[in-house]
């Protein structure tokens, strides 16, 4: 589970409230399924979705959430827009500035194929409108629960169907007067004047309505007793236990409602939350048994900081930012009313949770959201390890074949299984009386069937390698068998290279050299025997050997490692990428132990070594001449203040087989890159050095763009590219295209064949129905998968002065998915994006510094 996927919903602080609960505030709203029994917080204690002023722990019970217009606690729809960053992209209309695709952005080449997708139309009754009201209180009432309770005393006026976030009220009807005044009374007898002012009548397609639909849908999921974790909803009452790995899976769904080409539609996909059946305290205890006592606290911090935990008392997720060893469950904190309470007593009263270990430290989670517009950050959340479950998988689990195999049985769904699970959710919506009543009250309904439409399958590519041309089976998108034994396009001789190994791996080292001698002749690589260097199995010994033996004549260093210990790998890569710039190849010895795969592994190692020294493997036909292709991706370096590293990779020849690579560091909190101008200028110089002329087109594939950052990209990064191109020289005015690449999409596509659903073939393009009318965008399914459902990639052309037709952009994009030299097949994104990802990952994970620029013309990071 990646960091960007973890959206934690922690609410705003609320103090003690004296409310006479009347109307909807007094009881459960009609139509809701009663929540499971849960200890309700006592009045005056911490309530709400997350934290109290200053100190914090806790969240409101489900019944309380439903009292306050369920769903609107998570997202305010004030004029400034909602909190979910992806909605900020709604107002970015880039297509209107692209004259050549204003009329049509669809291509026509390829074979027509029938597809269906996990989208369902949302329909509304004729002349439907949403009425938005602003609510004022005199005197001012700060607490949202109190404001809601006072307003809902007048349910006879506003009606049973309403949505209120504390300031903005939405109704499916228009009140008689534009301004309506009513009076309410608090529990202590204070009279409050409430002014209800109509501010907007919203059509179904307005951005505010789109946000509203999503909130209403989340309300429906709560009615069905699904539990929100981050942005998604899960069913804790239907867990899947994997006891032999101490894991639990909660099945659930991702959902979003957006305006697509012709309809407003719900996109929903299956999601799975992987939890561990051990608490953080269990984890700490097990670690204590394996660690020296004086290193225990350091080791715990190293293992836990950055992880996401789930609180067992209210199913909220938090990121562990620190561990406070000076506090324990007996420590006290100050509540909103000024009184002090210990964690022990607080959890006993608030959640009926008994803490047994009174010496455990306290976990600290820093908030990310401020209180209101321009508000201050609330205090940190203080969590008890005993009451928190670990989530996600450790690196050890991810590298355990059996763990991943057992997980895949439940999480890797075929198209038909995925359609069945999504269909179950839609069936529940149509069959649940409470859900249907809610939808009827708002005048909304959903289609019952998956959306069907036509896509296109692009022509498969021919692979050129060493003067020969190969076809491959498009169903598998892999040409490793077809090209085996064929010479490469460009090879680098292995004349002067080192092989560093430990004594216990002497046999593996000799075996590797013998097998390399067997596989390299067919590739056209001339190879001499390596300089063999035996070292102790310590990081310092490897570094000492590198310092003593690597010279300016050394072409590449191969390090045979006993294990995949990160510290040793990092030290080797850091030295050879920065202090002594030399291509390097690290090999874990056990991968050479299986006789049935040893030749295939030796082949892969030889190919990687050739690439890292500057060789070229294969190519496809690239009709677009004088075009430089750029790929950009970002990685967050958690060890360096969580700053970002952007990998920048650009082609420097017309065949797009040679690449220039740089990286840029960016301060914390910024994903967009300031230093791209320097990278692009350097790439243009590298192109000029190889070709003696400048490219007439620059096409940028921009990956690593987070939700809500599209506007910044359009307004800031694109002008930076344009300024850079202008600064190259008078009269130089190449055409620029910028395409945003997005892998994390919830859309899934299924090919219809003989009454069954299956994965679309590689090369399937979708540019109708489920694309966005305000964007020049399309999907491509480029890769093949052996199991489960294939994931498409979304491409959004945000700037384009090329004048190229949609067919040409789509075909170029698909071609570029064929030239990633670490895999003899089609990958999910264009090769420069994957190269940029590999570079940024290496720098962020291992090097933490800018690599030496003398390596920039080689794929040293593969």
UniProtKB/Swiss-Prot annotation:
The modification Symmetric dimethylarginine is found at residues 14, 53. Residues 279-392 form the PAZ domain. It comes from the Eukaryota. The active site is at 633, 671, 703, 837. InterPro entries: ArgoL1, GAGE, PAZ_dom, PAZ_dom_sf, Piwi, RNaseH-like_sf, RNaseH_sf. Residues 1-48 are annotated as: Disordered. Residues 556-848 form the Piwi domain. Its main location: cytoplasm. Residues 1-13 have a biased composition (Basic residues). The record marks 382 as: Required for binding 2'-O-methylated 3'-end of piRNAs. Ubiquitinated by the anaphase promoting complex/cyclosome (APC/C) in late spermatids, leading to its degradation. Ubiquitination only takes place following piRNA-binding in adult testis. Ubiquitination and degradation in late spermatogenesis by APC/C is probably required to release RNF8 from the cytoplasm and promote histone to protamine exchange by RNF8. Arginine methylation by PRMT5 is required for the interaction with Tudor domain-containing protein (TDRD1, TDRKH/TDRD2, RNF17/TDRD4, TDRD6, TDRD7 and TDRD9) and subsequent localization to the meiotic nuage, also named P granule. Disulfide bonds: none annotated. Expressed in brain. Expressed in testis, specifically in spermatocytes (at protein level). Only detected in germ lineage cells of adult testis. Expressed in male gonads 2 weeks after birth at the initiation of spermatogenesis, but not expressed in female gonads. Changing residue 343 to A: Impairs binding to 2'-O-methylated 3'-end of piRNAs. Keywords: Cytoplasm, Developmental protein, Differentiation, Endonuclease, Hydrolase, Magnesium, Meiosis, Metal-binding, Methylation, Nuclease, RNA-binding, RNA-mediated gene silencing, Spermatogenesis, Translation regulation, Ubl conjugation. Residues 317-319 are annotated as: Required for binding 2'-O-methylated 3'-end of piRNAs. The modification Omega-N-methylarginine is found at residues 14, 49, 53, 371. Disruption phenotype: Mice display spermatogenic arrest at the beginning of the round spermatid stage, resembling the phenotype of CREM, a master regulator of spermiogenesis; mRNAs of FHL5/activator of CREM and CREM target genes are down-regulated in testes. Female are fertile but male are completely sterile, no sperm is found in the epididimus. Chromatoid bodies from round spermatids are not fully compacted and remain as a diffuse chromatoid material. GO terms for molecular function: metal ion binding; mRNA binding; mRNA cap binding complex binding; piRNA binding; protein kinase binding; RNA endonuclease activity; single-stranded RNA binding. One of its GO terms (cellular component) is nucleus. PANTHER family: EUKARYOTIC TRANSLATION INITIATION FACTOR 2C. Endoribonuclease that plays a central role in postnatal germ cells by repressing transposable elements and preventing their mobilization, which is essential for the germline integrity. Acts via the piRNA metabolic process, which mediates the repression of transposable elements during meiosis by forming complexes composed of piRNAs and Piwi proteins and governs the methylation and subsequent repression of transposons. Belongs to the argonaute family. Piwi subfamily. This is Piwi-like protein 1. It comes from Mus musculus (Mouse). The gene is Piwil1.
């Amino acid at each position: 589970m990646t960091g960007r996927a973890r959206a934690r919903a922690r609410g705003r602080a609320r103090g003690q409230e004296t409310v006479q609960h009347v109307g909807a505030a007094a009881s459960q709203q009609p139509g809701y399924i009663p929540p499971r029994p849960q200890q309700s917080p006592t009045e005056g204690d911490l309530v709400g979705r997350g934290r109290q002023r200053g100190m914090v722990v806790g969240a409101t019970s489900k019944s309380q959430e439903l009292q306050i217009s369920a769903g609107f606690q998570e997202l305010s729809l004030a004029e400034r827009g909602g909190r979910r960053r992806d909605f900020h992209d709604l107002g970015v209309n880039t297509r209107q500035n692209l004259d050549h695709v204003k009329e049509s952005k669809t291509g026509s080449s390829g074979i027509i194929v029938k597809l269906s997708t996990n989208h369902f139309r949302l329909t509304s009754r004729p002349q439907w409108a949403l009425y938005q009201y602003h609510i004022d209180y005199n005197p001012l009432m700060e607490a949202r629960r109190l404001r809601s309770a006072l307003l809902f005393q007048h349910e006879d006026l506003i009606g049973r169907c309403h949505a209120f976030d504390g300031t903005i009220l939405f109704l499916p009807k228009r009140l008689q007067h534009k301004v309506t005044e009513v009076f309410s009374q608090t529990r202590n007898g204070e009279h409050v004047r409430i002014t209800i002012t109509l501010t907007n009548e919203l059509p179904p397609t307005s951005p505010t309505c789109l946000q509203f639909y999503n909130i209403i849908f989340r309300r429906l999921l709560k009615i069905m007793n699904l539990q929100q974790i981050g942005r998604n909803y899960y069913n804790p009452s239907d867990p899947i236990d994997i006891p032999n790995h101490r894991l639990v899976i909660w099945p659930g769904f991702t959902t979003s409602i957006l305006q697509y080409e012709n309809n407003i539609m719900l996109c929903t996909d299956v999601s799975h939350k992987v939890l561990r059946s051990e608490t953080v305290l269990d984890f700490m205890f097990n670690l204590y048994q394996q660690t020296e006592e004086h290193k225990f606290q350091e080791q715990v911090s190293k293992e836990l900081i950055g992880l996401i935990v789930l609180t067992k008392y209210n199913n909220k997720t938090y990121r562990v930012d620190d561990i406070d060893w000076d506090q324990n469950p007996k420590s006290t904190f100050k509540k909103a009313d000024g009184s002090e309470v210990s964690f022990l007593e607080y959890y006993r009263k608030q959640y009926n949770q008994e803490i047994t270990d009174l010496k455990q430290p306290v976990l600290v989670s820093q908030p990310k959201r401020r209180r209101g517009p321009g508000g201050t950050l609330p205090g940190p959340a203080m969590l008890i390890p005993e009451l928190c479950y670990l989530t996600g998988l450790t690196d050890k689990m991810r590298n355990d074949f059996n763990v991943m195999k057992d997980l895949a049985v439940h999480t890797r769904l075929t198209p038909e299984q995925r359609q069945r699970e999504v269909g179950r959710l839609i069936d529940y919506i149509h069959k649940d009386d409470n859900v249907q009543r809610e939808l009827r009250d708002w005048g909304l309904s959903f289609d019952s069937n998956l959306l069907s439409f036509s896509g296109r399958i692009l022509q498969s590519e021919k692979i050129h390698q060493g003067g020969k041309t190969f076809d491959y089976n498009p169903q598998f998108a892999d040409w490793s068998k077809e090209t085996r034994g064929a010479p490469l396009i460009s090879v680098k001789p292995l004349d002067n290279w080192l092989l560093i190994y430990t004594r216990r791996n002497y046999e593996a080292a000799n075996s590797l050299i013998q097998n390399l001698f067997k596989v390299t002749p067919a590739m056209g690589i001339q190879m001499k025997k390596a300089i063999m260097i035996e070292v102790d199995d310590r990081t310092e010994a490897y570094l000492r050997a590198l310092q003593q033996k690597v010279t300016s004549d050394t072409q590449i260093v191969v390090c045979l490692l006993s294990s995949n210990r990160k510290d040793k790998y990092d030290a080797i890569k850091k030295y050879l990428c920065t202090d002594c710039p030399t291509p390097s190849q690290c090999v874990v010895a056990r991968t050479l132990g299986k006789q049935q795969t040893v030749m295939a592994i030796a082949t892969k190692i030889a190919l990687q070594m050739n690439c890292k020294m500057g060789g070229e493997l294969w190519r496809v036909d690239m009709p677009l001449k004088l075009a430089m292709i750029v790929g950009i991706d970002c990685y967050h370096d958690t060890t360096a203040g969580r700053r970002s590293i952007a990998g920048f990779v650009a082609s420097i020849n017309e065949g797009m087989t040679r690449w220039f690579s740089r990286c840029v560091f960016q301060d914390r909190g910024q994903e967009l890159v300031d230093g791209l101008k320097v990278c692009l200028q350097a790439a243009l110089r590298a192109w000029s050095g190889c070709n003696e002329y400048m490219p007439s087109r620059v096409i940028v594939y921009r990956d690593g763009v987070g939700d809500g950052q599209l506007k910044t990209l359009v307004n800031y990064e694109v002008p930076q590219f344009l300024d850079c191109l202008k600064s190259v020289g008078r009269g130089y005015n190449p055409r620029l295209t910028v395409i945003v690449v997005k892998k994390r999409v919830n859309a899934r596509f299924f090919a219809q064949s003989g009454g069954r659903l299956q994965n679309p073939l590689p090369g399937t393009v979708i540019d109708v129905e489920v694309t966005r009318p305000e964007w020049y965008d399309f999907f491509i399914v480029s890769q093949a998968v052996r199991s489960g459902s294939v994931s498409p990639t979304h491409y959004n052309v945000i700037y384009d002065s090329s004048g190229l037709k949609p067919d040409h952009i789509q075909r170029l994009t698909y071609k570029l998915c064929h030239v990633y030299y670490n895999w003899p097949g089609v990958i999910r994104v264009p090769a420069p994006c994957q190269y940029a990802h590999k570079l940024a990952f290496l720098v962020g994970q291992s090097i933490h510094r800018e690599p030496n620029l003398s390596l920039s013309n080689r794929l040293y990071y593969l």
